[in-house]
């Protein structure tokens, strides 16, 4: 198959040895991939690259309350410019607050007695929203822009594996070992 992509195993040392093949067929009707889209460099690259490889790219921004309306509008414009066939904002602000954030506030939960631990907890809610959306539209794959440097990759990968078990996980930034050099 000419345009077939082999997705390297995710998780590295974590043992998630699930090398997968997702054949893009290009254009409307190709393999659907949902990109967890923040509008940053890594997810913008992911949208553009997967479009070039023939995927039908669905960009989804899971908003836990950190994006302004202006930024969400800019994300939508950029997603379409990069080649997404659809863009959605998944508002999980209330769910995140009700199920997690308010308890961290009540408990004054801080990392190293200094930093709110909200970033790590919000990733799970973002990943859940992305997985739900991928299941809703019958996506073949989910992509995210996490690098191999932090724990976000694990939060996304594990949530996707549990919530969307038949869906492939694509992580171009990590798998291509992209850097600024």
Task: Outline where the language-model segments fall.
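Short linear motifs centered on Gly/Pro in flexible linkers and helix caps
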Residues: 13-14, 38
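Intrinsically disordered, low-complexity proline-rich tandem-repeat tracts
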Residues: 1-9, 13, 23-24
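Short, intrinsically disordered, charge-balanced linker/junction segments flanking boundaries
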Residues: 8, 16, 178-181
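ATP-dependent adenylation/nucleotidyltransferase module used to activate substrates
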Residues: 2, 21, 25-181
């Amino acid at each position: 198959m000419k345009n077939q992509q082999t997705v390297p195993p995710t998780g590295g040392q974590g043992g998630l040895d699930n090398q997968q093949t997702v054949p893009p067929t290009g254009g409307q009707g190709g393999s659907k991939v949902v990109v967890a889209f923040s509008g940053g460099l890594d997810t913008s690259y992911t949208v553009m690259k997967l479009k070039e490889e023939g995927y039908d790219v669905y960009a989804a921004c899971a908003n836990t309350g950190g994006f302004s309306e202006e930024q969400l509008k800019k994300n939508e414009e950029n997603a379409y410019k990069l080649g997404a066939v659809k863009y959605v904002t998944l508002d999980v602000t209330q769910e995140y607050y009700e199920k997690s954030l308010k308890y961290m506030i009540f408990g004054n939960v801080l990392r190293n007695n200094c930093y709110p631990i909200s970033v790590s907890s919000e990733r799970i809610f973002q990943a859940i929203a992305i997985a739900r959306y991928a299941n809703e539209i019958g996506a073949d794959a989910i992509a995210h822009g996490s690098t191999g440097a932090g724990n976000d990759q694990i939060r996304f990968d594990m949530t996707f594996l549990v919530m969307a078990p038949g869906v492939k996980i694509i992580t171009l930034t990590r798998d291509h070992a992209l850097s600024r050099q």
